[in-house]
Amino acid sequence: MENELYDVTIVGGGPAGLYTAFYSGMRDLKTKIIEYSSQLGGRMLIYPEKMIWDVGGVTPILGGQLIKQLVEQAQTFDPTIILNQKVEGLEKQPDGTFILTSSTGEKHFSKTVILAVGYGVLTMQKLEIEGADRYEVTNLHYTVQELEIFRNKHVLISGGGNSAVDWANELEPIAASVTIVHRREDFGGHEKNVLRMKESSVCVKTPFEVVQLHSDGDLIQFVSIMNKETNEIERVEVDAVIVNHGLKCDYGALEEWGLHIKDGVALVNEKRETNIEGIYGAGDFIDHPSKVRLIAGAFTDGILALNSAKLLIEPDAPKVAYVSSHNIRFKERNEKIGLQDNDYREVRG
């Protein structure tokens, strides 16, 4: 419906945004999610095969499976989901509501806005070697979507962060060989994982960097790596090359909205309120004194931001939602799966 006004519009469809959408349904708010990419999931789409250990009550789970479950949960109360739109413009109206304008020119109308944009639009740092892009359709990879495609292959990984170290550890049992190349002696990954890698069969080459790719047609067959201290060149035979040199983050026009942004993150208070009334933040995009940079912390951010939005819209509403075991919004759903429980709270929460 044109010019339809929503209670809350969540910008960003990663873990923070998805859980916030679910909780918004618990609080009986008309909700919209706007996501710039073609899929929900945010940064976790980059590592669907990595194990996630730090979500409370959830046994170790693949990133891709956690995304699937978060998306399913987010859709519990049927929020409106908009994909392939990057929010570029924000205009606050005299009545306190907002008009959000996307890259397509479409306008979205909302009483409140929750920014769960993570680190903005993310793009992989590419290998800075002329002609490298021609191999991206064959055996040059910037993420690992499926471990199995590397089984029994000779794999070279370039990078020294968490993802590079994790991929080395995960591929080591199934690949024919794994070589990791890092331009520094020290790795930026978690200490325990770096130690595990160094004690395994992974060949660690430091301080080296990739300087040339050698191919026969469209497949990389050898990689030349150079010692940063001696300029010595070595050649490594490969079946696949994985590059993890970090991510480029782009917030676009969002940085021009007048938010207090410091060191690439928006500053919020304990209620997850920004300096603009009616705009809140959740997840990696924000910082505050008690910030926890875990997926579980992003969920808490979303809850607190949503509660603040609820109270701005309905000042007399309960400060928090009733737990799902006693929330009237789950009564019908529980009955559908054969559960009967009369202890529900008949209130708007």
From Swiss-Prot:
Belongs to the ferredoxin--NADP reductase type 2 family. The keyword Oxidoreductase applies. Pfam families: Pyr_redox_2. It comes from Lysinibacillus sphaericus (strain C3-41). Its EC number is 1.18.1.2. Its cofactor is FAD. This is Ferredoxin--NADP reductase 2. It catalyses: 2 reduced [2Fe-2S]-[ferredoxin] + NADP(+) + H(+) = 2 oxidized [2Fe-2S]-[ferredoxin] + NADPH. GO terms for molecular function: ferredoxin-NADP+ reductase activity; flavin adenine dinucleotide binding; NADP binding. Homodimer. Keywords: FAD, Flavoprotein, NADP, Oxidoreductase. The keyword Flavoprotein applies.
